[in-house]
Amino acid sequence: MPVRFKGLSEYQRNFLWKKSYLSESCNSSVGRKYPWAGLRSDQLGITKEPSFISKRRVPYHDPQISKSLEWNGAISESNVVASPEPEAPETPKSQEAEQKDVTQERVHSLEASRVPKRTRSHSADSRAEGASDVENNEGVTNHTPVNENVELEHSTKVLSENVDNGLDRLLRKKAGLTVVPSYNALRNSEYQRQFVWKTSKETAPAFAANQVFHNKSQFVPPFKGNSVIHETEYKRNFKGLSPVKEPKLRNDLRENRNLETVSPERKSNKIDDRLKLEAEMELKDLHQPKRKLTPWKHQRLGKVNSEYRAKFLSPAQYLYKAGAWTHVKGNMPNQVKELREKAEFYRKRVQGTHFSRDHLNQILSDSNCCWDVSSTTSSEGTVSSNIRALDLAGDPTSHKTLQKCPSTEPEEKGNIVEEQPQKNTTEKLGVSAPTIPVRRRLAWDTENTSEDVQKQPGEKEEEDDNEEEGDRKTGKQAFMGEQEKLDVREKSKADKMKEGSDSSVSSEKGGRLPTPKLRELGGIQRTHHDLTTPAVGGAVLVSPSKMKPPAPEQRKRMTSQDCLETSKNDFTKKESRAVSLLTSPAAGIKTVDPLPLREDSEDNIHKFAEATLPVSKIPKYPTNPPGQLPSPPHVPSYWHPSRRIQGSLRDPEFQHNVGKARMNNLQLPQHEAFNDEDEDRLSEISARSAASSLRAFQTLARAKKRKENFWGKT
């Protein structure tokens, strides 16, 4: 018979058999593979003829591996050959011929024996164990009975053990006992080799016999341990707040005692324990007072205590306080109500006195020249302390510190006051100026470009003369002459503004003029807000212009009184820009912005802080001929004249809030109006806050109405 040589493949070398307690039972010996070989049909338990096999089964032959590739360890080849031959005294001639073939094969097995696959493990001892398996398996293959009629007494001891194992397996299956599944180790997948079948520990023989007895007898109920654990890991680990159980009585214990599953060995011991338990229960019943039994179904309906409910309460039962969530107190609705009232109070208090820096874009817009003056009140020289306290924008600390250090350098005074020559009122440091008689002017320096072009030659001469002359008298005369020029210009502008306001008031309900009328009136081309702004209420919010265009003629006509300045060079432009950024207008009230947006403003802040003078030296209305050049008076310069949005829009382009005829606020205030300053200041603050809160209330009402109409009333 030719020798078919097959060496160990790479797969067999890399993926070794993982040794476990199942690997021994799944050993690939012939007795394990064919446990029914040599057994009679009654021993096999066959009661009917086998059905036809639909698929042809190819017999499996073990690969022949040469002995030179096998390492048998300490086992010598003589031990392999010396296994005893089975004797067959009554075999016919055909069987004798087969026996000769078997002896010839055993002679060849010295060089190339037919060996089944070894079971391998990762340990170093597995090779020696595999070698011993080879020896046993060779003995089994050499002694396999060829004919079923050969008696069991001629089989070897190894074969008889395998047959006994097969019988035991069949008997256990018939008896209904749990049998370890026998898999062919050669056909095991890699998954089956790595993940071994989990089986319970083998039971004791006495317990197995007891099981067989219960299975065979029909009258004795079979005892089977509950192999499936019905209690989940969650129930085992989580011992929540269990409901209060009713006390158990002795009668209940007697009725339910058969529910406990006890092994037969322990039942005899339980009888004595049961008697002791009953005696203890009787003693307990005597000592404990009887409780009124309440049925369990009336204690809690629909609320099962779970881990989630024990750990996570509903959000309504928590309160975030001092950085941690705590349980809610009983007066939670009252606290919410109180907090909402406080928030509403703060909101009303802030309206009209605070301006967000997010709206700086609106302050810097070119459209601010169209707002009119909102107040006609006097200077703040004698503002009382209670009014100053009501003005939230004031800075009392800076008022105290800055007033103590008046500057004595005339150059600084000259530079700073050149930028503020038109100021006719006195301001105390630390008090904002919402009620100052503000002269109309362009919002920022960018609007003054057209007038700069016209007046540059004259202004340069004035600058040179200002640097040379330091006389205060001549400065006062020139300053008053400038005031008279302003009065003449004011009247012409007021007439023009009257025409625009009269045309705008002609609309029935007040509010913005329609777009066709605005086009007829002409003027600056507005943004897309022409179509999107509401007819009544609301301000025009504009985006900053990327390129600063030269101011057209229309803007020159609509400029305010403050657009005339005696000196406008690059230095004063930077100064005015710095001061305007420092004092961000807050709905008419000036506040100090501690975070200037540009670097050039930071350089000039210190100069403005130093230049201060006592208020009493400044005349309110100096009278001088207009021909003199101004040497400016010394005024407190830290609080710059406001370049803020004053009041409501008067330009016909921006008719949003026009509902009543206004008095002409562009006239300079008379001297008699400066008597009762406190009342004017109080009324100004209250009127401004009331107007802003009214607008906010109207906007909120419109939003609520729109929401109700959209979603439907609830």
Swiss-Prot record:
One of its GO terms (biological process) is negative regulation of centriole replication. Keywords: Cytoplasm, Cytoskeleton, Microtubule, Nucleus, Phosphoprotein. A motif (ST]-E-Y-X(3)-F motif 1) lies at residues 9-15. The keyword Ion transport does not apply. GO terms for molecular function: microtubule binding. Residues 622-635 have a biased composition (Pro residues). Residues 138-147 have a biased composition (Polar residues). It is found in: Nucleus; Cytoplasm, Cytoskeleton, Microtubule organizing center, Centrosome; Cytoplasm, Cytoskeleton, Microtubule organizing center, Centrosome, Centriole. A motif (ST]-E-Y-X(3)-F motif 2) lies at residues 189-195. The keyword Nucleus applies. The modification Phosphoserine is found at S83, S123, S126, S242, S263, S314, S560, S584, S648. A motif (ST]-E-Y-X(3)-F motif 4) lies at residues 306-312. Residues 79-152, 391-571, 616-637 are annotated as: Disordered. A motif (ST]-E-Y-X(3)-F motif 3) lies at residues 232-238. Residues 460-469 have a biased composition (Acidic residues). Microtubule-binding protein that negatively regulates centriole duplication. Binds to and stabilizes microtubules. Belongs to the MDM1 family. This is Nuclear protein MDM1. It comes from Homo sapiens. The gene is MDM1.
